[in-house]
């Protein structure tokens, strides 16, 4: 089954409408297609790329996808579009995350770390405070990834080394430092322990470093821990829907992976108030490894 469940629209910083992205998925021959727009951010997270479009436009995004689903409901020759979300992991705002997830009938939730604190990890001009600060940021990034995986709020951990995007060389230097891979392994183990699927993304192939997310060292850890994976394009343009999936499929197979596991919830998270209550208790407390059954 050829699936791409991590895509974006012009609701945020994508370039095309939900309908245009869907038609690109049909043209690409996808069997399963999902639209997973960025979740709205608190005002403190002033990312100029997309925060200005929210929260008002998110409702329109949901309506657009639901209209697409209704239109395609009787079509057996085309994939049924799914409503997903890329949830920004905001550990200082647990109620913001939980409240948002109760508002919409998502089929799946992708968890992402685009920030460490208020630091936007994808912006090159912000990585100017030296090696020691960068190494501390990498450590915090993977500590929070483990916490996200154990929270019970997400189905998928997306682009697991996205933090390398604007600091590629420095990130790989850090990975070679003693103890770094052990810290990453803690995050990967949290995925395995809590049934969170790891995304293998072709988006990194479109960056100057031309390396998938995640890098080989992390793929090896995922294979060792038996984490399930799914493939994704993280397309922000219709030309990238399904792009590079064949390449990352070969990459994943080289580590012994299959990728027929899909990150779909049997029911919407808002029907599971106990999960949200557990998540709030967990996020408001210290950092023990709690496990929540979805």
Stretch-by-stretch model annotation:
Residues 18-27, 59-66, 95-98, 139-146, ...:
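Amphipathic, non-transmembrane alpha-helical secondary structure
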Residues 34, 110, 158, 261-263:
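Residues embedded in well-ordered beta-strands within globular domains across many folds
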Residues 92-97, 120-123:
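Short, conserved acidic/polar surface loops in the N-terminal third of protein domains
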